[in-house]
Swiss-Prot record:
It comes from Oryza sativa subsp. japonica (Rice). It comes from the Eukaryota. This is Homeobox protein HAZ1. Its main location: nucleus. Residues 345-354, 373-389, 433-453 have a biased composition (Acidic residues). GO terms for cellular component: nucleus. Plants over-expressing HAZ1 show increased length of the uppermost internode and panicle, due to enhanced gibberellin signaling. Keywords: DNA-binding, Gibberellin signaling pathway, Homeobox, Metal-binding, Nucleus, Repressor, Transcription, Transcription regulation, Zinc, Zinc-finger. One of its GO terms (biological process) is gibberellic acid mediated signaling pathway. Residues 15-36, 51-67, 716-737, 746-760 have a biased composition (Polar residues).
């Protein structure tokens, strides 16, 4: 709603003060429109220059959400003063200045104040362009390090800080050392690992800190000595005339009523003007009575001494000089900076004291001595003495006619061409003479050893010996004293050989193969384990045609256990079936073709032998042991000892043999009983028996005993006549029960029937695939026997 008025616009200060927070100001009119309250708003539109309020102009009423900005009072004082906006430009300038104070601008003439609205931006741009803008603000002072030209007060403050910091650092390092130095409760800290390098570093750091504190006190004493009054100015009572007192800061003696010179009551004996101090010393701050006053330097020294006494436990006073502060740090500083003065010339020596010939001759001696030590191989003591003598001769020769000559006979680098003297010594001749003298010395050196070797050679019936040769080395290696007449001669020759080798430093290498005698391993084995056959020889019997001796050894393994009173002996592992004829009990064949049960009996001859573990005793020893085992399986200790002495065995070996034989006899008896029971049960159930045939060698003949040969053909024919099918037993997982061979005289008493093995050829014709199955079984048995031998 728009309102018009013809009255003049009047500003009411009271209304402005009361309505400072509102966006509108009430104005009074003449009252022609009664009952209606006319409200008018004074607006200042930015961007319009010289806008004036006329009574005939219409002013629209706007809400409080309008973006038009008006002047408002910020405080009560401003509200009390009349605000008469005579010009819009002045109002805007005040707003701009107010913003300038709240947020200072950078002194950039191109930047202007910008508002959030476009109208405000236009108003500010026009005002600044007209020249009525805000003046640039002053540069803000940077906060950082103080200027380099510091005052004495700053120096004292830095000394305080430095001393306190270095003391704290030193206490830290001392605590580290004390932590490892103490033994702890009940000495437990002694077990800790000590960081030696770190502790050494801490000790060095402590000395460095002490030296820094000492340096700080030295600087402080130097500041205390500046402007100090001479002691001659003081009388015997310690008083000084006022005319002689001057200011230590400015050096002036002028004194005014408000700028008097005050003497320090410390140790510096200096005076200062009141206004020369920083900060100035006012009259009311001067101590009254007997109370003393200290200058800033003395005050700083007292503070540093108090901190030092508190943290380090020392007893220093203000009267002590800086040299008494940590005197042990002086040695550290001197040790790090001192130079070995032994290599330097004396102070009173001149330049002509230096003799270049001595230094050059010293270098030549070193080079020559090192060359002779590496090439000739003489003793170090003799070579050094000879080198020193030769060097002295060279020095005397080279220093002729006031010039220096090196080893090659050439003049020194600083000499001219005219210095050559044709009458001088010839260097080539000198070198030849020296080489000849060296050779003569060497020959003299080795003459004694040569004579000694010649005498030894004559005593041994040999030619003269000059040194260790390759032929002598070979004869010494190959012969064990056989080339000499007797043992004393051999010892003397070896002694001479060692002495000649020791006397010569370098022995030329021999360009030939090393003469090493081949070792007889069989002899060594026989010495260590006796003359019995070794395991390496037994391994050969697994492949190829075996000899009758090897077969007898395998047969003897079972025969040694077959003669036990229990009637047999069994193996806990698989038996070596290759050299035996196996009889298998009948098997239950399932519909699926798997073998449910398998038992094996091995028929063996009654030949002499031993078990796999006891085979190294020999057949004679095993025969005697088996005879005693038949008589008494549990012999007494005395019997065992007698057997051990008689057979040349130890008591433990005899005891182990009897225990193992008893064990395997019990196992064999158990297996035999189980086989008989199974055989009876299978016969009652009308099961078929199967005989597995093992082919041996190229002739496919299995030899059970030398005297008793069983043919496979008869057994196979009998089995065919009986109507029992033959099958090859391919199962190798079960153990083989070894049964004793039944002799003709015991056939009537033995309940078990003898099974004769037929010939392999007829069996192959009757049973297909028999050869392959027996080959697989043979390999499995070989593997088991290898395990038994290696596990021994």
């Amino acid at each position: 709603m728009d309102k018009t008025t013809t009255s003049d616009l009047v500003l009411d200060n009271d209304n402005i003060g009361s309505n400072a927070g509102s966006a509108q100001e009430p104005l009074t009119t003449n009252g022609k429109t009664s009952g209606v309250r006319n409200r008018y708003k004074q607006t200042v539109k930015r961007g319009r220059k010289g806008s004036q309020i006329s009574p005939s102009k219409t002013y629209p009423l706007r809400s409080s959400h309008s973006n038009v900005r008006v002047l408002r009072s910020a405080s009560k004082k401003k509200n009390e003063t009349p605000i008469v906006p005579t010009n819009d430009n002045t109002a805007v300038q005040r707003v701009a200045k107010k913003r300038k104070r709240s947020k200072p601008l950078r002194p950039a003439p191109s930047r202007v104040l910008r508002s959030t609205s476009e109208k405000k931006n236009k108003a500010h741009n026009e005002l600044l362009n007209d020249g009525a803008g805000v003046q640039p603000a002053e540069k803000k002072r940077k906060v950082g390090r103080p200027p380099k030209g510091g005052t004495p007060k700053d120096d004292y403050l830095m000394i305080r800080k430095r001393v306190r910091y270095v003391l704290n650092r030193m206490n830290y390092e001392q605590s580290l050392i004390q932590a490892y130095a103490s033994e702890g409760w009940k000495g437990q800290s002694l077990e800790k690992i000590r960081p030696e390098k770190e502790l050494e570093r801490a000790k060095v750091e402590i000395l460095r800190c002490k030296s820094r504190i000492r340096e700080a006190f030295r600087n402080l004493d130097s500041l205390l000595s500046e402007g100090k009054l001479d002691e001659s100015m003081f009388d015997s009572a310690g008083e000084i005339s006022s005319e002689d007192i001057f200011c230590a800061a400015c050096g002036s003696k002028d004194v005014t009523l408000k700028n008097d010179i005050i003497l320090c009551d410390g140790i510096c004996d200096r005076g200062f003007h009141q206004y020369c101090l920083n900060p100035p010393l006012l009259a009311e701050d001067i101590p009254q009575g007997d109370e003393g006053w200290l200058c800033p330097a003395c005050d700083c020294k007292i503070d540093c001494i108090d901190v030092l006494n508190e943290l380090q436990g020392v007893k220093l006073s203000i009267h002590d000089s800086w040299e008494k502060v940590f005197p042990e740090a002086a040695s550290f500083l001197n040790g790090s900076k001192q130079i070995d003065a032994s290599d330097l010339p004396s102070d009173d020596s001149a330049d002509n004291d230096y003799d270049p010939t001595l230094a050059q001759g010293h270098k030549v001696d070193e080079e020559k001595s090192s060359g002779e030590d590496g090439g000739e191989g003489l003793d170090s003591d003799d070579s050094s003495s000879e080198d020193s003598e030769s060097s002295e001769k060279e020095k005397s020769k080279t220093s002729q006619n006031g010039r220096t000559v090196d080893d090659l006979g050439l003049p020194s680098e600083d000499s001219e061409d005219g210095d050559f003297d044709p009458a001088g010594p010839d260097s080539d001749k000198e070198q030849n003479d020296e080489s000849n003298s060296d050779q003569s010395d060497e020959s003299d050196f080795t003459s004694d050893s040569d004579d000694f070797c010649a005498e030894i050679a004559k005593s041994c019936g040999q030619d003269e010996i000059s040194g260790p040769s390759s032929s002598q080395i070979r004869t010494v290696d190959r012969t064990d004293g056989s080339g000499f007449d007797g043992e004393p001669n051999a010892e003397n020759s070896n002694l001479a050989f060692m002495e000649t080798e020791l006397e010569q430093d370098m022995v030329l290498p021999i360009s030939s193969k090393r003469q090493v005698e081949r070792l007889d391993y069989k002899k060594l084995y026989n010495e260590a384990y006796g003359k019995a056959s070794s395991d390496s020889s037994d391994d050969e019997e697994w492949y190829g045609n075996s000899t009758p001796e090897k077969g007898n050894l395998e047969d003897s393994e079972t025969d040694s256990l077959a003669e036990s009173p229990q009637g047999g002996k069994g193996f806990s592992r698989r038996a070596p079936v290759r050299y035996h004829n196996n009889e298998h009990t009948p098997q239950n064949v399932r519909p699926g073709g798997s073998v449910s049960d398998q038992q094996t009996e091995v028929l063996c001859s009654n030949s002499n032998g031993s078990t796999a573990k006891n085979r190294h005793f020999g057949p004679a020893i095993n025969q005697k042991l088996k005879a005693h085992f038949k008589e008494d399986p549990y012999p007494s200790r005395a019997t065992k000892e007698n057997l051990a002495q008689e057979l040349g065995l130890t008591f433990n070996q005899v005891t182990k043999w009897f225990s193992s034989t008893r064990h395997y006899a019990r196992v064999a008896a158990t297996k035999k009983e189980n086989n008989i029971e199974n055989h009876t049960a299978e016969n009652n159930n009308n099961t078929n028996t199967v005989d597995s045939i093992q082919l041996r060698g190229s002739n496919d003949i299995v030899s059970v005993d030398r005297n008793d040969m069983v043919s496979e053909e008869r057994t196979g024919q009998s089995n065919l006549n009986e109507g029992t099918p033959l099958r090859s037993d391919t199962s190798c997982g079960q153990s083989v029960a070894v049964t004793p061979m039944v002799h003709p005289e015991n056939q009537g008493n033995d309940s078990s029937s003898n099974v004769r093995t037929p010939n392999a050829k007829s069996a192959e014709k009757l049973i297909p695939g028999l050869e392959n199955s027996d080959e697989a079984r043979r390999k499995a048995v070989q593997r088991e026997l290898r395990k038994m031998k290696t596990g021994r």
